[in-house]
Amino acid sequence: EPKKSSVDDLFAKLRQAGAENVASSVKTVKDSSHKTTETPKKAVEPPKPIEPDLKMFERRDSALIAVDEMLVKKLKRVLADEENAMLNYLQSKKAQVALEKVLPSFENQLQTFVEATSKELIEAAMSGAQSLSKSLKSDLRKKISNATVMQVLSKKLADDIVYPLRERIQKCVESSDGSASEMSSLIRSTYREWKMKQVDKIVGDISRLAYSRGAYLVLETGVKVCWMVDPNGPPCADAEDNSLAGEVNCGEKFPTGDEHPVIHAGCKCLVVPSSR
């Protein structure tokens, strides 16, 4: 009888342990079930580009009409003078001619373009400044100086005109094999293309850069600014990236590494204060 009692006790303990395990399992399942029904966190919405202010773009385009017309005339005048100087030089030469004898130095050539266009480019920059500031013109002019504007525009003139033009003239020299008459013919063709086509293509980019530069210069450092894409401009992934960046402190750069437009050929974007 004692043996039977001990066996009964053993089974009783096992049944008790089994019941406790089942209860524990049920509790675990309930806890797990409870956790899965928690309200999921809301997904973070991707940033959206700021709404374009069409009036700001229209004001810019209107302000640059007269500037562009004068820039075209002055740039073509410089190109014509360069061409004539080269052709006159070549007419007096019978022997082979090298590039350095035909073209002025890079620095002198760039300086000629800078001096010819600085008046109109400063005017464009002032228009940009006045689009964001109501200060007196005399006060704005302290910020919109030849140095602050032309240090940026000089590089633009070099990249858009001087470098590519010199490259074309280099090819003229190489293709002519030193023949002055052949070189003259190729140079005429090159300058004709620049005066008839290229100048009109690039002048808008140059004046819009001056306008944006002027607007940027009157903003106080640290002011929150946004990159605004012109819906009438060409599609550009870089511009979209800058726009999606949202607010940036003035003085800091947008994702593309630029402080303000223009960042590519045909760029029509603007940088504007967030609290405009």
Language-model region placement:
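Acidic, glycine-rich two-metal-ion catalytic cores of nucleic acid-processing enzymes
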Residues: E193-R276
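N-terminal leader/targeting and assembly helices and adjacent pre-domain segments
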Residues: P2-D200, G204-G214, S274-R276
